[in-house]
């Protein structure tokens, strides 16, 4: 659903019903906007719809409260889809630069990682490498003022999608340069038993057999950490080289998230992350021209369809000796990387920009 809010002002008290992920932040924003004591502002969040980061800010709630105070009557504000694209925040554009080296036996010898404007969530190196540096430029995942021409905000696992895509793509490039299987290469450089466990579990469930990339099988692997949760995903894709299109056929995802309070809910979150991840990996992109937003509805801003959904297998590993960790975002962070690595395995072409649109895939195929 789009952003919506209903506001009612009664004397020096305000009640606002809003679709928001941040009710206390909304309360404070509304109080400042209409000059009320925050203790006299009540925000009610109906149990409906989803946010995925987009409902973090509260412009529609502030707008409704201002109007209600002005006219002296309850006011409802509901954005159209076009207004949603225009007024809402965007996931920040980012650039990642990586320099890395391997020794004579293929071992990682150094790692120099710089991320600009995506923040450092997901950037720390968890592979064993003797010489490494990770630097994040910009303020958090929004960058310093003036970094972006439009408002930026959270998008499910803010920044980690970008950082995991960059790191896991580079790890696959290093494995290929070393002449080693990408799963075996990762295991060779992992010392954390939690990550080793999820990767081995995913590979076993998938039925992975070692092969140097590109094996032409269309298999990809990626690992990540988010919100204290360890995740490893393996995917199989088919690429139409002529059209530059990708069909994700199968995804196996193993996740270790401490003690799991609601296993069915955790499984559904993993599946939702995988499906949603198809979008940022393959199609979701906003185009601008002369300060104008060209994509204002789903006719040009393509999100995943039911017909895109692959066979999905999820494995939740028990870790009852550890406290509960995040379950709503980790599985999405690896989707860009696992699909990119599968495309490279299928075709030998490496796509280094998200989303991996048909034009970008064909360009990568053309350049080899």
Tell where the protein language model's regions lie, with residue ranges.
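Cofactor-binding beta-sheet edge motifs in enzyme active sites
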Residues: 1-368
């Amino acid at each position: 659903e789009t952003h919506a809010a209903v506001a009612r002002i009664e004397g020096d008290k305000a009640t606002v019903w809003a679709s928001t992920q941040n009710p206390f932040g909304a309360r404070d924003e509304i109080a400042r906007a209409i000059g009320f004591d925050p203790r006299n502002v009540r925000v009610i969040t109906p149990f409906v719809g989803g946010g995925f980061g987009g409902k973090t800010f509260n412009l529609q709630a502030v707008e409704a409260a201002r109007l209600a105070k002005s006219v002296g009557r309850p006011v409802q504000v509901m954005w159209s889809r076009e207004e949603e694209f225009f007024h809402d925040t965007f996931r920040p554009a980012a650039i990642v630069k990586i320099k890395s080296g391997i020794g004579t036996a293929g071992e990682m010898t150094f790692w120099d990682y710089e991320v600009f404007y995506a923040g450092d969530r997901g950037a720390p190196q968890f592979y064993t490498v003797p010489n490494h540096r990770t630097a994040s430029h910009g303020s958090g995942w929004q960058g310093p003022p003036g970094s972006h021409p439009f408002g930026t905000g959270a998008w499910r696992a803010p920044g980690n999608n970008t950082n995991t895509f960059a790191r896991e793509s580079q790890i696959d490039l290093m494995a290929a340069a070393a002449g080693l299987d990408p799963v075996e290469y990762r295991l060779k450089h992992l010392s954390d038993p939690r990550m080793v466990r999820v990767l081995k579990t995913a590979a076993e469930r998938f039925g992975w057999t070692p092969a140097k990339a590109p094996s032409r099988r269309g298999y990809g692997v990626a690992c990540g950490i988010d919100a204290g949760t360890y995740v490893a995903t393996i995917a199989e894709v088919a690429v139409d080289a002529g059209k530059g299109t990708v069909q994700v056929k199968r995804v196996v995802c193993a996740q270790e998230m401490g003690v799991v309070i609601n296993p069915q809910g955790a499984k559904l979150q993993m599946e939702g992350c995988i499906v949603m991840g198809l979008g940022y990996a393959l199609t979701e992109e906003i185009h601008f021209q002369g300060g104008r937003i060209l994509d204002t509805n789903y006719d040009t801003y393509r999100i995943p369809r039911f017909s895109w959904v692959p066979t999905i297998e999820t494995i939740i590993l028990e870790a009852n000796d550890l406290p509960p960790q995040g379950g709503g975002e980790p599985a999405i962070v690896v989707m860009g990387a696992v699909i990119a690595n599968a495309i490279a395995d299928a075709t030998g072409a490496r796509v280094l920009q998200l989303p991996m649109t048909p034009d970008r895939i064909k360009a990568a195929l053309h350049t080899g």
